[in-house]
Design a protein with these regions (language model features):
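Periplasmic peptidoglycan-binding/tethering modules of Gram-negative envelope proteins
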Residues: 1-51, 129-135
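Periplasmic OmpA-like peptidoglycan-binding domain that tethers envelope proteins to the cell wall
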Residues: 55-135
Length: 135
């Protein structure tokens, strides 16, 4: 599975690989995205309270403005998929483009790092387990 997650006392962060969810440069979900999205939906259904934050992320290829739009469109596509499956929640969407990399887009010598860029192309879902943080 291309889905990974971490859980704290307050929330669960789910990471989904954009390469599994979307074709290159597209914001339409691929059919093979269903399995990972279903797992994420199950977590939201079981644990979700309050706001569900969906953020899209890209690698560093392309302009900042373009990547921001693409990442937001991808977050919207994931939200639409959840809602089509009857998962009505208070969703908050963000398109962060290439501003929050989790891996280097280039090697130390400045050459391209395809593996790092692949990790950065992702959709993150933050599932709040409590309606108010700090409770």
């Amino acid at each position: 599975s291309s889905l990974s997650g971490t859980e704290t006392g307050f929330n669960i962060q789910i990471n989904l690989s954009s390469d599994v969810l979307f074709d290159f440069d597209k914001a339409e979900l691929k059919p093979e995205a269903d399995a990972d999205l279903q797992k994420a939906a199950d977590i939201i259904r079981q644990k979700g309270q309050g706001v569900i934050l969906i953020t899209g992320h890209t690698d560093s290829k392309g302009s900042d403005a373009y990547n921001q739009r693409l990442s937001l469109a991808r977050a919207q596509a994931v939200k639409n998929w959840f809602e089509a499956k009857g998962l009505q929640q208070n969703y908050q969407l963000e398109g962060l483009g290439a501003t929050r990399p989790i891996a280097p887009n280039t090697h130390p010598d400045g050459s391209d790092n395809p593996e790092g860029r692949a990790q950065n192309r992702r959709v993150e879902i933050i599932v709040n387990k409590t309606t108010q943080l700090g409770n």
